[in-house]
């Protein structure tokens, strides 16, 4: 069948080789077809069979039953293994679908990372692309929001592939019926309280759904090309305007910032905030533009917070600093054999042979900045977002930035930190 041949060409271009691959399977026709195609491709090429992952959001009475179906049917289709990932939701407010989507990707990416799986396949198709475009158009999205999805993207260290992007829902359903596959019909797909359902029905009601969907996807592709051009110039601006400091903050040089076209300057501010907050999702435009406009007023006193970051004017620069109150403490058992990630900004290597439980917390918790840190000529608030090692409320080790001598209260423990913010930036602006 043509769909299968085209799919094989797409997947061959991804160059998985013999790396382990996971497939996100909701139980709907598109993800079942994706798993069927992928297992057949793996068998044909004598490669490792894919693992099926399904997320139980627990939002409907039948959620567990559907997850159990996926596990059972994935085995029948030839998956290597299958797992149910449960969403431990708390106090859901606002847009449930958006929160469920964020949780789903978080659970999938975490499982892949914990199991050394680098590649995750998802079943987005051409109709999803068109519906998403219309949804975002209604919300007033800009170039990025209206851009087409990529065949390949990068999230939290995992490559996400979308091999069905060029196929329509009708082509996928035709394939499923031809191969007598079983799938679940999600009732929420027909619920008119969701805007996506409205746009799905709108496309179906058009005189020629196939042509309209194709043209919407073409417009989204034009937007993607424009977004890539803007990102190219944003990367150049980062080289000229931005300093990423070892102490875990970003400094934007205003003299250079004011010379940039507004769209590039806005993106530079946006991605600086996202890199410090280590968030994949962008802050609300309405909140961001208020801060941006304040920065453009050259005599204004900029002192704002957004996405867990402090945005401060300091001399002739804008500083993006992590809000210490938003940082999660972590508990570890010493000794450690490898570095640990802290706040997604630092890789912490803790040296010492003590066998004990310690907490890595923001320095602000100690209410004391050690003298050696004061030698760094920077805004004092920067220090409060640095990690310290605590035991029973007492400091065992302050952060050693350059690893050039003792800086601890206890000679047996030392905390060497390396900033990972540049890596955060690279993953954000390397489309």
Swiss-Prot record:
Q: Where in the cell is it found?
A: Cytoplasm
Q: What class of enzyme is it?
A: ligase
Q: What are its GO biological-process terms?
A: tRNA modification
- Kindly list the GO CC terms recorded for this protein: cytoplasm
From the Swiss-Prot or TrEMBL record, what is one GO molecular function term?
ATP binding
- EC number(s) stated in the UniProt entry for this protein: 6.3.4.19
Which keywords has UniProt assigned to this entry?
ATP-binding, Cytoplasm, Ligase, Nucleotide-binding, tRNA processing
- Which parts of the sequence bind ATP? 26-31
Record field: catalytic activity: cytidine(34) in tRNA(Ile2) + L-lysine + ATP = lysidine(34) in tRNA(Ile2) + AMP + diphosphate + H(+)
Which Pfam family, just one, is annotated for this protein? ATP_bind_3
Q: Record's family?
A: Belongs to the tRNA(Ile)-lysidine synthase family.
Record function comment = Ligates lysine onto the cytidine present at position 34 of the AUA codon-specific tRNA(Ile) that contains the anticodon CAU, in an ATP-dependent manner. Cytidine is converted to lysidine, thus changing the amino acid specificity of the tRNA from methionine to isoleucine.
The free-text domain remark for this protein reads: The N-terminal region contains the highly conserved SGGXDS motif, predicted to be a P-loop motif involved in ATP binding.
Q: Please name the NCBIfam families in this protein's record.
A: lysidine_TilS_N
What this protein is called in its record is: tRNA(Ile)-lysidine synthase
């Amino acid at each position: 069948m043509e769909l299968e041949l085209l799919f094989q060409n797409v997947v061959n271009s991804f160059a998985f080789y013999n790396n382990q691959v996971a497939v996100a399977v909701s139980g709907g026709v598109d993800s079942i077809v994706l798993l069927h195609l992928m297992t057949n491709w793996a068998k044909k090429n004598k490669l490792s069979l894919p693992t099926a992952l399904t997320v139980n959001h627990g939002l409907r009475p039948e959620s567990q039953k559907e997850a159990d179906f996926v596990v059972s049917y994935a085995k029948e289709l030839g998956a290597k293994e299958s797992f149910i990932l449960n969403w431990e939701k708390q106090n859901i407010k606002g847009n449930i679908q958006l929160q469920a989507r964020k949780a789903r990707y978080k659970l999938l990416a975490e499982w892949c990372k914990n199991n050394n799986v680098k590649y995750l396949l998802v079943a987005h198709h051409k109709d999803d692309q068109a519906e998403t475009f219309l949804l975002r158009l209604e919300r007033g999205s800009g170039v990025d929001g209206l851009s087409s999805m990529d065949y390949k993207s990068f999230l939290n260290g995992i490559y996400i592939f979308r091999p069905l992007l060029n196929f329509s829902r009708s082509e996928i359903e035709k394939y499923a019926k031809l191969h007598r596959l079983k799938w679940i019909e999600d009732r929420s797909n027909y619920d008119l309280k969701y805007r996506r359902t409205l746009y799905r029905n709108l496309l179906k009601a058009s005189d020629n759904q196939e042509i309209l969907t194709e043209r919407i996807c073409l417009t989204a592709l034009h937007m993607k090309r424009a977004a890539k051009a803007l990102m190219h110039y944003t990367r150049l601006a980062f080289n000229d305007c931005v300093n990423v400091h070892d102490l875990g903050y970003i400094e934007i040089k205003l003299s250079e910032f004011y010379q940039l076209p507004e769209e590039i300057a806005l993106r530079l501010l946006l991605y600086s905030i996202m890199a410090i907050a280590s968030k994949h999702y962008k802050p609300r435009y309405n909140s961001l533009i208020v801060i941006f406009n304040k920065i453009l007023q050259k005599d204004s006193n900029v002192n704002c917070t957004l996405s867990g970051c402090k945005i401060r004017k300091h001399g002739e620069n804008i500083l993006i600093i992590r809000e210490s109150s938003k940082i999660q403490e972590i508990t570890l058992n010493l000794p450690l054999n490898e570095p640990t990630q802290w706040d997604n900004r630092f890789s912490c290597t803790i040296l010492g042979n003590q066998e004990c439980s310690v907490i890595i917390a923001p320095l602000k918790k100690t209410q004391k900045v050690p003298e050696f840190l004061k030698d760094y000529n920077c805004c004092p608030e920067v220090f409060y977002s640095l990690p310290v090692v605590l035991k029973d409320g007492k400091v065992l080790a302050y952060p050693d930035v350059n690893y050039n001598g003792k800086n601890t209260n206890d000679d047996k423990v030392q905390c060497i930190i390396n900033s990972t913010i540049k890596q955060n930036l690279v993953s954000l602006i390397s489309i």
